[in-house]
Design a protein with these regions (language model features):
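Extracellular beta-rich repeat passengers
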Residues: 1-22, 26-145
Length: 145
């Protein structure tokens, strides 16, 4: 589900994305709030924020298959991925979303080599994550800044 510049007047509640060929949820700017999100067996990232997204996301779960990951040479698979923009500039508004009450699960077994981090927060992002649990191993890092 890709959201570009969606404002806070929009309500997103009880949405499931399954078997996505890219990110389950990606926000490019905007300030929309979302609740009760499920990401199931997606290829790329579960929750990806960019370009000044400043909304709040609460009550989300990601269920990952350890053998299903993005095989593109230009990408890898993360629970969270967040950038201010592609170059890491100080452009405003800054990506400053807040996530709370999130659970990420990777099933037991050998994890595909394209998995990277549970939390990949980079390029001048100011993402905040509260009360969140990860169950399973991301091979590169749990938290990558």
């Amino acid at each position: 589900m890709t959201l570009g510049g969606v404002g806070y007047g929009t309500k997103i509640d009880y949405v499931q994305v399954s078997h996505s060929g890219d990110d389950a949820y990606e926000w490019f700017g905007g300030a929309v709030n979302a609740k009760h999100l499920i990401s199931y067996r997606t290829l790329d990232d579960d929750f990806d924020t960019d370009n000044g997204f400043s909304g709040n996301v609460q009550y989300a779960v990601a269920l990952r298959d350890p053998l299903v990951a993005d095989q593109c040479s230009c990408s890898d698979s993360n629970g969270f991925e967040s950038d201010n923009d592609g170059s890491g500039s100080t452009a405003l508004p800054q990506t400053s979303a807040k996530f709370a009450n999130v659970s990420i699960y990777i099933a037991n077994g050998t994890v595909d080599k394209k998995y990277r981090s549970a939390f990949r927060i980079r390029r001048n992002s100011a993402l905040s994550i509260y009360n969140t649990v990860v169950n399973g191993a991301f091979p590169k890092a749990g938290l990558e800044l």
